[in-house]
Design a protein with these regions (language model features):
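Intrinsically disordered, low-complexity segments enriched in polar/charged residues with Gly/Pro
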Residues: 3-7, 46-48, 80
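Short, solvent-exposed secondary-structure boundary/capping segments
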Residues: 36-45
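Short, glycine/acidic-enriched capping/hinge loops at junctions between secondary-structure elements
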Residues: 30-31, 40
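Mixed-charge, Lys/Arg-rich low-complexity intrinsically disordered regions
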Residues: 1-17, 22-26, 33-36, 106-110
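A short beta-strand motif that forms part of the nucleic acid-binding face
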Residues: 31-34, 64
Length: 110
């Protein structure tokens, strides 16, 4: 129940298009972790701004690249751009695009 409550408090959901506020790239969320699930080494090396580990973190397919990023919630904003996401792995995680611009998740990863 605690994990469900923590995910319920996440600001974004799988299939939602977001923009990274620091690095200004678009992407689509494919999974949500209620708290940081990476290693200490990764956090110390990559998460230079030291975002909180006790808030949601998101797995994001980066638009027009073949990258997948792991991003703290505080670095994401909902994206107002309504254009579709282009990513080679999009169809492995997400289905049809909905009328509201989000994508239908094919399955829940967590």
């Amino acid at each position: 129940m605690e994990r469900y409550q923590m995910l319920h408090n996440a600001k974004y959901i799988p299939g939602q298009i977001v923009r990274h506020s620091r690095f200004d790239y678009r992407g689509v969320i494919i999974d949500v972790d209620p708290t940081f699930q990476g290693t200490e080494d990764w956090y110390n090396e990559v998460a230079q701004s030291r975002p909180p580990k006790d808030h949601p973190w998101y797995h994001v397919l980066v638009d027009e690249q073949d990258a997948v990023t792991y991003v703290a919630e505080r670095h994401l904003d909902a994206d107002a751009d309504s254009s579709p996401i282009t990513h080679p792995m999009l169809e492995a995680f997400l289905g049809a695009r909905r009328d509201d611009g989000t994508y239908a998740p094919l399955h829940t990863m967590n």
